[in-house]
């Protein structure tokens, strides 16, 4: 666990009945809120769930709502399903956790609004999102909002160096603004990142992994943004627009093939 994540989780002890936790992608919102949810439901049930995955928690007081595996969105049926859970009279608090607000369509929010208004007073409805703008005003006005701030680049740099991570200055700077790369399960991405400079100089992309390509695009955008005020500002802005479109296509349900993505990325080198 990152030190800044540990500090936030340990110091957040008061939960409002309806809360949206939000922050930028670099704030790692879902991972942080997952930990908060484990903390809350452990307190309610007087059991220790900290070492369990959320979908392994078998508690009558907890309901996890997220898109099914392989799906991009939470269905209307899924959103309506917690109605009995939310309206059942019980002496204990209950928790409905919507793991990613980005997985709810606009029409789905109407169903969520109705469900939330029918919920008992002892129900916690917790939503996590990396894009507060994706949440309709009708929901925002009814929920307490808590921002999860990104760690400062200096904090991330100190942590990375303490972990023995060292690379060229540009890569280290990129990592300092994208601390998620330092998570244990992203070792493959971290290893690939060290080779991004050579791929750029050779104008040849070796990666065949979609997440690596997505990170490579982020790295190119990061480098281009540092040059938008220079003599090649116009070209850099055009390349940033193209790279953002590639990133969007990589992450869309009907995403680009790896080979086409690599061709488009190469044109931006």
Language-model-derived ranges and their functions:
Residues 22-24, 64-69:
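A short hydrophobic beta-strand->loop->alpha-helix junction that borders the nucleotide-binding pocket
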Residues 91-95, 120-126:
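Loop/turn-to-beta-strand initiation segments
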Residues 69-75, 101, 145:
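Flexible beta-alpha connector loops of hexameric P-loop NTPases
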Residues 7-12, 73-95, 103, 110-114:
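Conserved alpha-helical scaffold flanking the Walker A/P-loop in AAA+ ATPase domains
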Residues 81, 115-121, 145:
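A short alpha->loop->secondary-structure connector
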Residues 1-56, 121-123, 130-269:
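Charged, glycine-rich active-site and insertion segments that engage polyanionic ligands
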Residues 100-119, 131:
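Conserved Walker B catalytic segment
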């Amino acid at each position: 666990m990152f030190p800044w994540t540990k500090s936030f989780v340990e110091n957040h002890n008061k939960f409002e009945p309806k809360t949206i936790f939000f922050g930028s992608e670099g704030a790692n919102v879902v991972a942080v809120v997952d930990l908060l949810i484990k903390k809350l439901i452990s307190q309610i049930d007087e059991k220790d769930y900290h070492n369990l995955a959320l979908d392994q928690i078998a508690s009558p007081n907890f309901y996890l709502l997220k898109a099914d595996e392989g799906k991009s969105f939470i269905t209307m049926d899924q959103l309506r399903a917690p109605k009995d859970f939310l309206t059942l009279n019980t002496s204990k608090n209950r928790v409905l956790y919507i793991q990613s607000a980005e997985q709810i369509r606009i029409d789905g929010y109407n169903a969520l609004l109705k469900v939330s208004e029918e919920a008992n007073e002892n129900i916690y409805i917790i939503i996590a999102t990396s894009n507060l703008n994706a949440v309709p005003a009708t929901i925002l006005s009814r929920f307490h909002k808590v921002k999860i701030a990104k760690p400062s680049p200096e904090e991330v740099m100190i942590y990375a160096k303490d972990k023995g991570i060292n690379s060229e200055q540009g890569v280290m700077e990129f990592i300092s603004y994208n601390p998620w790369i330092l998570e244990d399960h992203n070792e493959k991405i971290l290893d690939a990142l060290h080779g991004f400079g050579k791929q750029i100089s050779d104008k040849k992309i070796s990666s065949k992994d979609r997440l690596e390509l997505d990170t490579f695009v982020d790295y190119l955008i990061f480098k281009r943004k540092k040059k938008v005020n220079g003599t090649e500002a116009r070209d850099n802005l055009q390349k940033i627009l193209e790279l953002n479109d590639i990133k969007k296509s990589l992450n869309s349900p009907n995403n680009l093939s790896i080979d086409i993505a690599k061709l488009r990325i190469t044109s931006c080198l």
